[in-house]
């Protein structure tokens, strides 16, 4: 969806990620039939109360990875299901801890280009998987689509998922 994903740092991260997810769904709904089911999501990384979105440059990616190195942070995914004019949004949270990263590892990872389109400058499902020393919560939240929560939201709307 073509929306402004800018987040207000003065507002709670949970509120902002939910807002962006819901705005994405509403933007798509304009081109859909009312009975269509629209699923949207937005993911952010939060450390020390600071929202880390997608890096703006390689230098920004390096800055983010240095900030996350050896520390615990939280990934939040806002998930919205919209159909029949009814919208529901939930925020799923997962705690992640990175081991200490070397400058060489960070530079090599950024050089792959992989972190450039990912919140917090890393993809847990890719090369950055070797950075994760601990995960507390939903792995799929970190990937950007918490499928267990999505399935529950769809079931509440009468949509059968796997029987």
Question: What is each of the regions a protein language model found here?
Answer:
Residues 9-163:
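Anionic-ligand binding patches
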